[in-house]
Amino acid sequence: MSEIVIETKQLTKQYGTQKSVAKLNIHVRRGRIYGLLGRNGAGKTTTMKMLLGLTPPTSGEVAIWGKPLPGNEKKLLPRIGSLIESPGFYPNLTGTENLRIFAALRGLKNQNAIQSALELVGLPYRDKKLFSQYSLGMKQRLAIALAVMHDPELLILDEPINGLDPIGIAEVRSFIRALCDERGKTILISSHILSEVALLADDIGIIDHGVLLEEESLVDLEAKSERYVRFTVSDTERAAEVLNGLLHENQFAVQDGHHLRLDSAKVPVAKIVSAFVQRGLEVSEAATVEESLEDYFKRVTGGEGIA
């Protein structure tokens, strides 16, 4: 088991009577990408702010590299790079000039750090374009460059692909993956885009209304997705009688009045279809259905799902 880099215990943030985050227990392991997945307003940004000491928790604990965050900020935070909402860049300066100011404030003396960070996110080092002239995607790239400029061990990135076009999303996904695989970085990202989290993360935490519903590796989460056989027949009532005779136990359900769902078949599907036909039933479909991550997300949140 990998070392735990971030651990929270019963982490809670309450505004008045409203709990933005409730008793959150997350575990981010060294050298892996953890995707915190949830709809807008689910509590992702608030969680990340508490992990960085930007907002105090109402209750609960945050530990980073095994050390409690309160009282150890000066030791821990320099080892972390973050993107939370939009950094305060100067509109009348270029991207490079903005990074130079932040580098000076941090006491960063590596002369190549700025150029390397810009190259990593696909922005030119000698570009004369002012920040005010940047597109939303370019602004997001510059924010990520700021997060990685000091070569941190841990990255905490809130919605890092926000504002990017499909090509930009693929590029950001690629260099985030490379930061983990090639440079050994530990990375926590948040997103409301399930498909992107599934392509990028090793481990996933599903958060909804401030509550962590699931925390699993991507492999284990995919294994939890349901798999069943769906039959479409001319008469579901008669088909149910056939299944009762074959299975001798309640392993199926009628869906929408037109379909039968069989969760586990001890009898071969071909034999079931044959039995239907022998009883004079028309079988227009006998298909194995595998639940997608989107379907799983809908099921565990009881909601409409996300992108």
Predicted regions and their residues:
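Generic structural signal for individual residues within well-ordered alpha-helical segments
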Residues: 77, 99-100, 115-118, 170, ...
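Short, charged/small-residue-rich alpha-helical element at the C-terminal edge
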Residues: 227-300, 307
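Short, Lys/Arg-enriched, disordered terminal segments
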Residues: 1-3, 306-307
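Generic alpha-helical secondary structure signal
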Residues: 74, 112-115, 125, 170, ...
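ABC transporter nucleotide-binding domains
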Residues: 3-8, 13-189, 194-208, 212-214
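Alpha-helix N-cap/helix-start and coil->helix boundary motif
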Residues: 12, 96, 120, 194, ...
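ABC transporter nucleotide-binding domain
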Residues: 174-263
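Non-catalytic alpha-helical coupling and interface elements of nucleotide-dependent molecular machines
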Residues: 104-107, 302-306
